[in-house]
Amino acid sequence: MKYDVTSHALGAHTLAVFRPRTEQPLPVLCLNAARSGDWDGYLPRLAADMGKTLRPAMLACVQPTDWNRDFSPWPAPALHPDSPPFAGQADARIDLLCDTVLPFLSARFPTLPGRAHTGILGYSLGGLAALYALYRRPDVFGMAGCLSGSLWYEGFLDFQRENIGCLSDARVYLSLGRKEERTRHPRMGRIGACYEETGSLLRISLGADNVALDLNPGGHSSDVDGRMLLGLRWLLSFT
């Protein structure tokens, strides 16, 4: 299916929109990425499936000003002595998506209304922020993709244990590289256990059919495009 990628100014922010060329209302997925160009490796393959084996969908990406600030849910210590601490301002970005970006898209383009057709996904810290957004705004998001997400983030498992009850009728795609837990860093080395518990919590709350946990070959940076494509395909197979 042919598509367009357009850029829109929203105050101080730049919004990139991937939209298949169709007049039918579309589901919307917000993408937590360092820049919209990160999708160049998989958009053509995704678009080729749309209208055939996959329902068309719109993707929206607002480039973050500061990755560690915009995708961290609350302040936390730095991973390394020479790195800045996490500033913890993901709430502001989530509100930007929910209260500005999504209304802008629905006013400008035909979109499918409701949380069942609205999702968010991301990779690494962006994946953590995507899953956090599902907890933070369950009134808006009904699906999330967390790929190699930073679920080792300080306090995040406790946050999930305390808030898992707020999730219902949602779908979650989880993905992790099999080698990611092979690290000497004490926090990042817990990623395998963090993913296992997260998957268990979500399956109990949402049902096994609504949660996918894929373990992929390689480490954190292995086949990012391919894994993003798998996550998008799984989420869009339900819309």
Go through the PLM ranges and name each one.
Residues 1-239:
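Non-catalytic cap/lid and distal C-terminal segments of serine-dependent acyl enzymes
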